[in-house]
Amino acid sequence: MFVKKIRPLFLIALALGLALTACAPAATAVPATEPVETATSPEVPTEAVVVAPVTLKIAVLPIIDTLPMYVAQQEGLFAKYGVNVEFVPVASAPERDQLLAAGQADGAVNETLADMLFNKDTIQMQAVRYALRPTAGHGHFFILASAKSGITTPDGLKGVEIGVSQGTIIEYVTERLLQSAGLTADQIKTIAVPKIPDRMALLASGELKAGVLPDPLASLAVGQGAVIVADDSTHPEFGFSVISFRKAVIDANPEAIKGFLAAIEEATALLNADAAKYANLLSDQKLVPPPLIGKFQVPPFPIAGVPTEAEWNDALAWAKGKGMLTVDVSYADSVNATLLP
C-alpha cells in the first residue's frame, strides 16, 4: 500500500524536473571563426622620404659641342631622368679648367688632352662620352689659309707659320692632319695666337697666312674669304671632344651621371632627327655667330661611346713629345664607359 503511494509521487517529481530543464536557457558557444578583439595602439601615419635630385654643375663654353645639353634642358629630359643640371657659362678653356680644379663645376665638354693634364699626378677627371666627333662632310677643326696667301693645299703650308692655340687640341689636330698629308715635323711651323678673334682678324687682313679654327667660326671665316686647306672630317680620331666629370663627383653620384648621360642620349636622337627644331638654341646660347644664323648646318652628333685606347695613346704620345707630360696617364683610369645608357 505504501509502495503504491510512492510511485505516483516519484513520477510527478520526475515530470516537474524535466519540465524545468526544458525551460532553462541554452548555453551560448563562441564560434571558432569569430575573431577575438584585443586592445591595439592607434596607427601612426608615416610619410615617404623624398630624396632631392642631385644637381650637376656643368661648365659650358659657347661652342656647338654643347648643343645636345641645351636640347636636353629644353625638352625636360634631365628632369625625366631624375637629375638637376645647372649650366655655368665660361669664356675660355683656362676658366673652365679653373672651375673644375676648384670644385666649382662638376663636369664640362673638353678634350682628352685636358683630362691627361688633370690626371698626370692623380686621377681627377674621367671622360664618360664623346661630345662631338667629326664625320664625313662635317669637320670640327679647319686649317684655313688667308685669301691673300695663295695657299690652297697642305703642300703650300710647308714652312708657313700657322696661327694656333699652342699646347691645345688645335695644335695637336694641326700637326696630325699635316703629317697625314705628308708633311714632316720640320716642315710644320706654328705660331701662338691664343685668342680666336685675333686669329680670325689676322687671317682676314692677310697678316697671318694660315690659322686653325673650330666650326662654326671656320664657316664664318670662309664666308669672309678664307680658304679651307684641310679639315678633320677624314680623320675623326684627332678632332673629337668629350664630356668629362670630376672623379669625386662620379664616385659620389654615379646614378646622377647615368641619368645625365641618358638624357644626352635621348636629346642626341631628337637633334639628329630634326635639327631645325632647335634652331632657336643656336642663337639663344650664342653657339653660332649671328651672320650664320639660318645658314649653318648643324653636324650630326655621336651616339653613346667613349674614346678608344688608340685615340688616347696617340694624344698622350703627342703631349709627351711636346714636354707637356713626362709620365704615362692611364687610359683605363681616365676613360669610363660604365655609365653610358
Question: What residue spans do the PLM features occupy?
Answer:
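Bacterial N-terminal signal peptides that target proteins for export
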Residues: 2-10
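Bacterial lipoprotein signal-peptidase II cleavage site
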Residues: 23-33
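Short, glycine-/small- and polar/acidic-enriched structural segments
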Residues: 34-184, 190-193, 209-215, 228-231, ...
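Short, solvent-exposed loop/beta-turn-alpha elements that line the ligand-binding surface or hinge
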Residues: 80, 134-136, 302-309, 331
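Pocket-lining segment of extracytoplasmic ligand-binding domains
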Residues: 113, 122, 190-191, 195-281
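Secondary-structure end/capping motifs
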Residues: 251-326
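Conserved C-terminal helix/tail region of periplasmic/extracytoplasmic solute-binding proteins
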Residues: 317-341
